Amino acid sequence: MKSLETIKDKRFLAILFDVKEKVSELFGDKLRQLVLYGSYARDEQDPESDIDIMILVDENEDKLQGYRPGIVEIMTDLSLKYDTFISLSRKTYSHYIEYLDILPYYQNIYNEGIEIYGKKIA
């Protein structure tokens, strides 16, 4: 996974920082990792590209579903604010790790992704 320092565009960094702040407020200490993936992570975006971000949390699947209204609100508010569609996907961290070696989708996120936030584990 790549580091956030690979991004030089200040406007885009401001968007990512805003996403990080809003998602952190929603999930609190349950937030484990935020990862930018897709065309923006590969630096292949065009004017029609959305911003894809995976939210990985320390929560069980049932409780994670309860965060959906908050996620939709963040996506709507920030997409309107920045005039760019921001797509937020959420998964439990344990599910992501369990299927990382199996699912190409998760492998692409890991290999091409840029970590926006990562909780340090002691």
List where the protein language model places each region.
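Catalytic core of pol beta-like nucleotidyltransferases
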Residues: 1-30, 41-47, 58-122
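Short beta-strand->loop micro-motif that forms the acidic, two-metal-ion catalytic signature
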Residues: 52-56
